[in-house]
Amino acid sequence: MRAVVQRVSCASLTVEGHSGAQIGPGLTVLLAIAPGDGSRDIDWMVRKLLGLRIFEDDSGKMNASVVDIRGALLIVSQFTLYGDTSRGNRPGFSASAPYETAHEIYNQFVDRLRSSSPLVVQTGVFGRDMQVSLTNDGPVTMILDTP
């Protein structure tokens, strides 16, 4: 499982031309599922996202989590994070889980995230064309890969 995590002051998305989810301060998470990802990966990523201290505390240090600031999360599926361009210029996506498997793991991930925290968790629509708008705060961007 791979996530590109961005600290945002706001984010929103449009799904096939229609307004979709939106959040205020928090995290936008672009999430890709790999073959073999399962419950252990979901648990690790949920713990990491909720505990990641990339927000400023009262002294201005990056020492607060999204939970500490009572932020929100926008989760967007993005299989292209596993794109392989090592052979030519057109990316291959064989490192991404098949659609049905990825969809199931993605839904489990979102459910686990929602049940693990009182924070607002918004999502895109899995497998659909989306336009994501965000204001990256900092900018702060992290790339997380499950072990």
From Swiss-Prot:
Molecular function GO labels: D-tyrosyl-tRNA(Tyr) deacylase activity; Gly-tRNA(Ala) deacylase activity; Ser(Gly)-tRNA(Ala) hydrolase activity; tRNA binding
Protein keywords: Cytoplasm, Hydrolase, RNA-binding, tRNA-binding
Domain of life assignment: Bacteria
Catalytic activity: glycyl-tRNA(Ala) + H2O = tRNA(Ala) + glycine + H(+); a D-aminoacyl-tRNA + H2O = a tRNA + a D-alpha-amino acid + H(+)
Short sequence motif Gly-cisPro motif, important for rejection of L-amino acids: positions: 138-139
Any one Gene Ontology BP term: D-amino acid catabolic process
Pfam families: Tyr_Deacylase (PF02580)
SUPFAM superfamilies: DTD-like
EC number(s) stated in the UniProt entry for this protein: 3.1.1.96
Compartments, record wording: Cytoplasm
Single GO cellular component term: cytoplasm
Protein family per UniProt: Belongs to the DTD family.
Subunit annotation: Homodimer.
PANTHER family: D-AMINOACYL-TRNA DEACYLASE 1, D-TYROSYL-TRNA TYR DEACYLASE
Domain statement: A Gly-cisPro motif from one monomer fits into the active site of the other monomer to allow specific chiral rejection of L-amino acids.
Function: An aminoacyl-tRNA editing enzyme that deacylates mischarged D-aminoacyl-tRNAs. Also deacylates mischarged glycyl-tRNA(Ala), protecting cells against glycine mischarging by AlaRS. Acts via tRNA-based rather than protein-based catalysis; rejects L-amino acids rather than detecting D-amino acids in the active site. By recycling D-aminoacyl-tRNA to D-amino acids and free tRNA molecules, this enzyme counteracts the toxicity associated with the formation of D-aminoacyl-tRNA entities in vivo and helps enforce protein L-homochirality.
HAMAP family: Deacylase_Dtd
Protein's UniProt name: D-aminoacyl-tRNA deacylase
Organism placement in taxonomy: Bacteria, Pseudomonadati, Chlorobiota, Chlorobiia, Chlorobiales
